[in-house]
Design a protein with these regions (language model features):
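Flexible, polar/acidic helix-loop-strand segments at domain edges
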Residues: 100-120, 339-424
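Membrane-proximal, proline-rich intrinsically disordered regions
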Residues: 23-78, 534-542
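Conserved, well-structured interaction surfaces
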Residues: 45-49, 53-59, 93-165, 177-189, ...
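Long, intrinsically disordered, low-complexity segments
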Residues: 23-24, 38-44, 95, 125, ...
Length: 542
């Protein structure tokens, strides 16, 4: 397949028109319209593209309609958008000013089985699984590598279901039968077996690419290693038995692969900043991108991917580039998500964060990763729920922007060209270091220390001779804030639900934070699915 992947998402989506049940419907009916013979109406290539595209786009209509998931606004249902909401708004990193239904429940950890955004994400994951099952039913014997890619995408979706919901409906086929409920530990085992036996051996060898390279945006062996490392990192949460040795093994495979930390500064832009810019597929940063989710301002548009991470976190008064240039280089400034004070403290532990613009903040923090704006803003999110809804109560995150290192314009005034690196090599460095510390009485060995120091050196931050687990948890936040990993990280460290006494501002709906029940370590199965499928059992506490 020689077509550059980034530029055929939209065409592929239009080529494949699949009839799915509404997200307010059920999983107990045939998810593919039985009157539509997809094998005769599309090609293996376009069917494969749709499996990828459901992560990058709302649906066949791009940003503006025909969403894959009904019952929720198409842009709101975006994969990355709801990954962010579920993983960031529920934690010590982000809080949102909006009054949309479900937002305050995420801010304050009070979600239940009717939560519209959790339901939307749940069904988007199953829509993607359906696309993958359909591809494998129609074209599973067509090309071994393509089938392995589809199996990886299906496994990735099941991984997010495993992580978020635990005991979920499970099917690998297109059928009118109600899916059986799979236990969390059994789904974990299935994922390990699937990735080791059916995915990794058949994927292409690990090879970083740029947007001008054939195959950019398609997964290779490194993505399988990364997902295996994620699974092993959280094995104790998922199964009750830790497996730090295998977490290190698969993280090391990524570290030793051709994927590397990107370390080249260009002009005013640090190496770290370039990972999140409008030309991150072209500027060299993609050497770190194990799995980039592709965006293009003209051809692959979405309100739920990098535009959400830019516009949703900015009001366009931020000064990212210079004192004379305001905004993130899109016309979007939706003034929603911003930092909780706890995240600011990760960079300014003495509680002395200055009210300076984004372009000046990294120097003030002595850390290139401090990509946020404090100009005209308060560190505090406010003293009551009304003040939480004021966007300037909280520093504005400017991590993602649509500027380009060569100064050229974006392809579109609103929709960015910045890809979202769903998996990047830096994650393997931190996974190895954490697993290393857990095998060494809570402190890194020389090798684990070296991997964290590599990240900190890239960020021009000071290094240390060793790191404790608490320091590693903070380092996860500094390196990956607003990238959709935090909730999983806090649960793994024992810092989320239960009597953990790790509190943050507005945790549990109290300004000073409070413990909440451990049942919130799992999301609730949506009520609509519970009603539709008698095989399911609601997670405890809902």
């Amino acid at each position: 397949m020689n077509t550059k992947f980034k530029y055929i998402f939209s065409a592929a989506a239009l080529l494949l028109s699949v009839g799915l049940t509404s997200c307010t419907g059920d999983l107990d009916v045939t998810p593919i319209d039985p009157n539509l013979n997809t094998k005769d109406n599309t090609s293996p290539e376009s069917s494969l593209n749709k499996c990828y595209a459901h992560i990058a786009m709302a649906g066949n209509g791009g940003a503006n309609g025909d969403s894959d998931v009904d019952g929720i606004d198409g842009g709101t249902s975006g994969y990355v958008r709801q990954l962010f909401n579920s993983q960031e708004l529920t934690t010590d990193e982000a809080i949102c000013a909006w009054g949309d239904e479900g937002i305050s429940n995420m801010n304050f950890n009070t979600y239940d089985a009717s939560h519209p955004m959790l339901k939307g994400f749940y069904y988007r994951l199953y829509v993607g699984i359906t696309y993958c099952n359909q591809y494998l039913a129609d074209f599973g014997d067509y090309n071994a590598t393509m089938s392995a890619e589809v199996r990886f995408i299906r496994a990735l979706n099941y991984y997010y279901l495993l992580d978020g919901w635990g005991n979920v409906p499970f099917t690998t086929a297109i059928s009118s039968d109600k899916p059986a409920r799979i236990q969390r530990a059994d789904l974990y085992k299935w994922l390990i077996d699937e990735l080791k036996n059916e995915v990794e051996p058949k994927l292409n060898d690990a090879s970083p690419k740029t947007s001008t390279t054939t195959g950019y945006g398609r997964v290779d062996k490194a993505a399988a290693w990364m997902l295996l490392a994620r699974l092993y990192m959280n094995a104790e949460v998922y199964t009750g038995t830790a497996d730090w040795a295998n977490a290190k093994l698969y993280a090391k495979k990524v570290i030793d692969s051709p994927y590397k930390l990107y370390t080249t500064k260009k002009g005013q832009w640090s190496a770290y900043q370039q990972l999140f810019m409008g030309d991150n597929g072209e500027n060299g940063a993609s050497v770190e991108a194990v799995f980039p989710i592709l965006q293009d301002g003209l051809k692959t548009t979405s309100y739920g991917t990098t535009l959400y991470l830019m516009a949703g976190s900015n009001d366009n008064s931020e000064h990212i580039k210079s004192a004379t240039v305001a905004g993130n280089n899109t016309t979007g400034g939706w003034a929603g998500n911003r930092m909780r004070p706890d995240l600011v403290l990760k960079f300014f532990p003495n509680n002395d964060a200055p009210n300076v613009a984004a372009y000046a903040m990294p120097a003030a923090a002595d850390d290139d990763r401090a990509l946020f704006d404090g100009e005209g803003r308060n560190v505090s999110n406010g003293d009551d729920e009304k003040s939480v809804k004021v966007f300037t109560n909280g520093f504005s995150v400017c991590k993602f922007n649509n500027f380009k290192t060569d100064g050229t314009a974006g392809h579109n005034a609103l929709f960015p060209d910045a890809d979202f690196f769903l998996m990047r090599a830096a994650e393997a460095y931190l996974m190895y270091a954490e697993a290393d510390a857990r095998q060494n009485n809570g402190t890194t060995t020389a090798q684990g220390t070296a991997y964290i120091n590599a990240l900190r050196t890239r960020a021009n931050a000071t290094t240390q001779t060793a790191y404790s687990l608490r320091q590693i948890c903070d380092e996860w936040s500094r390196e990956f804030y607003f990238e959709g990993l935090r909730r999983t990280t806090l649960i793994r460290f024992g810092y989320f639900g239960g009597n953990v006494n790790y509190n943050w501002n507005w945790k549990g709906g109290v300004k000073s934070g409070r413990n909440f029940d451990s049942h919130l370590n799992l999301f609730p199965i949506p009520t609509s699915d519970m009603v539709a499928n008698s095989n399911l059992i609601q997670n405890t506490g809902y």
